[in-house]
Amino acid sequence: MEKSKNIWSLILTEIKKELSEEEFYVWFENLCFLESIGDNIKISTPNLFHKNQIEKRFTKKIKEILIKNGYNNIVIVFTNQPPKTHSNKQETKNPALNETFSKFDKLKEKTTSKEAIQNIQDRIKMYIKKEEEEPTNFKNPFLKKRYTFENFIIGPNNKLAYNASLSISKNPGKKYNPCLIYGGVGLGKTHLLQSIGNKTEELHHNLKILYVTAENFLNEFVESIKTHETKKFKKKYRYLDMLLIDDIHDLQKKEGIQEELFHTFNALYEDNKQLVFTCDRSPSELTNFTDRLKSRFTRGLNVDISKPNFELRAAIVEKKAEEDGINVPKNILNLVAQKVTTNVRDLEAAVTKLKAYIDLDNIEIDIEIVEKIIKEIIIYEKETTNEPNNKINIENIKKILLRELKITHKDIEGHSKKPEITKARHIYAYLLRNFTELSTVEIGKIIGGKTHSTVLYSINKIDRDRNNDKEINNLITELMNKIKKN
């Protein structure tokens, strides 16, 4: 115990050399040695806010001091647990406030500078005020632990979104801020968004992270207006370190909540706090959304998730079957992957139905049963989406593109470097990616033998241009509408 106290005294001595008198008294005067357990030395702080600030500001420096003096295995653990000799007597309703301001008696004895004392007093009042305003006992009830990066299956359709999400978790607020992940229903947007929250919580224990659906965000806002607690609503969302909002498209046509989101966005963004959103379409395709809010979404990274190709669908089906303990021939699973082309959710639903047949009916799965299950899922999908039942024909896409842009087959499949022809190829690649399940390699073969990277560049370029160029956005929207109608 005595050795641990000496180590803590050493740390204080070294820290004091590098801080001004005022800073040292603000952060270290009220710390108290609590106990030592093995290599852990526990230090008591006056309150939770003080604990968080000490960890944030000085953990790295303390570690350097320990290593420098040969205490490589020693870990300093800060806690707001009071010392064992701590009196429960409270001078006011806020004991933390009493403890914090008691430091001024000592400070006054050691300095004659009234200005220095006043400066510190003002700063501490500000910290205490912030502590009282910030939400305490922060909980994140909507994060589901089952969503992780480890059980997310990666393929060419979602790799960029996956890598960006993982990077955000490791360094929130640094890169890709804000980030908007967009794509159709059941493709894994929620899985990635929840994984960001879970991984960030695992790596950064002190951060306040909140996942919420756009619908719940709206409902909370409406309720706060009804109960005259809008101030409480603002505090909840503007003191976060990371805000994750799912299905942002649900806020279309709702001007009041868009206004609130705009101000919440600004408050967090200007304080380098991480924002991540999901949407069923790119920002340029959002309707009844204020331009200034849409412009905020495009400040950072916009990344899409498209429908999975066969290889990824097969991997998803196999993993789901393994998780559910289903032992069926691989050709059965491949048939599911081949026929269910809509999204991840439908693939998993098909495997769940297979399990039900096995567990409840105790029958052997054959091709006939699989085809029956697939038929049920495909019919349900057609009834519950606005997508056309017939697959959009590649030739129809090309026909409409050539007609509207007034170019020829030779132009689109050739090697002309004319700007208008190059632009047409970019658009063709973008349309094929959005209306078909073709991979970038397959699209490249259709457009005159272009490489994967060339096709990917074309798709990303049009996506960026739609955000920045109104004329291009209008052209693409018009082409897409004509293709859908055709």
Swiss-Prot record:
The UniProt record lists the keyword Transmembrane: no
GO cellular component: cytoplasm; plasma membrane
Annotated positions binding ATP: G186, G188, K189, T190
GO biological process: DNA replication initiation; regulation of DNA replication
Matching PROSITE patterns: DNAA
Domain observations: Domain I is involved in oligomerization and binding regulators, domain II is flexibile and of varying length in different bacteria, domain III forms the AAA+ region, while domain IV binds dsDNA.
Record-linked HAMAP family: DnaA_bact
Protein name: Chromosomal replication initiator protein DnaA
Protein source organism: Borreliella burgdorferi (strain ATCC 35210 / DSM 4680 / CIP 102532 / B31) (Borrelia burgdorferi)
